[in-house]
């Protein structure tokens, strides 16, 4: 049996939307509780909040009653110097009609959305300050002097038993060599990636055509 005519329209596939996550601060301390503003494309919605730092470190289920809400997340000193927070939500929205416009007379279609943000937690509490006070401000070639060294923690409290290495170098030699003293905290606390790869099977969901959904 052969039938002539146009090809039937394909069923549209499900497409994800974007969730906007806005951290309340540019930087946090390890003892803070981060407030994250969530701007969702639909509500109500069920969601899964994941904290990522070289893998999953925390998973929490959330429910959004409104499109705009705030999620509280207690931080940890194990998350230095940063973590990635991702929110994946699912729900239902109005189905489009044949003209591509939302039609409330049709059954709702499934919907999903996701978004991520980075929370910076610099290791400031683990940094030390060294104050150098020379006995003499100027010296002649071959002269000698004494130098007082004071080590303080991030709260400006003196640190006892600290080990120091002091080097006296001609500043002009360093300038010619282009030497720049590196920050040791950046060496020991480099920026961490999420370390997680997501696969979304909902992208394979085929939606009913509007003419089919009416029956």
Regions found by a protein language model. Give the residues of each.
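C-terminal segments of large proteins
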Residues: 1-215
């Amino acid at each position: 049996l052969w039938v002539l005519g146009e090809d039937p329209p394909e069923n549209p596939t499900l497409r994800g939307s974007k969730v906007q996550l806005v951290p309340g601060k540019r930087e946090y301390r390890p003892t803070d509780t981060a407030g994250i503003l969530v701007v969702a494309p639909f509500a109500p919605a069920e969601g899964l909040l994941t904290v990522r730092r070289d893998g999953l470190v925390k998973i929490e289920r959330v429910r959004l009653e409104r499109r705009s809400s705030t999620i509280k997340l207690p931080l940890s000193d194990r998350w230095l110097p940063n973590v990635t927070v991702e929110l994946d939500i699912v729900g239902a929205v109005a189905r489009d009609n044949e003209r591509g416009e939302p039609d409330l007379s049709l059954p709702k279609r499934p919907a999903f959305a996701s978004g991520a943000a980075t929370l910076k937690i610099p290791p400031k509490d683990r940094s030390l300050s060294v104050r150098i006070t020379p006995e003499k401000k100027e010296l002649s070639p071959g002269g000698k002097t004494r130098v007082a060294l004071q080590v303080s923690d991030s709260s400006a409290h003196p640190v006892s038993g600290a080990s120091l290495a002091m080097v006296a170098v001609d500043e002009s030699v360093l300038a010619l060599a282009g030497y720049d003293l590196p920050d040791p905290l950046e060496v020991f606390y480099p920026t961490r990636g999420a370390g997680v790869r997501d696969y979304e099977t909902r992208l394979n969901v085929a939606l009913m055509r509007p003419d089919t959904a009416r029956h």
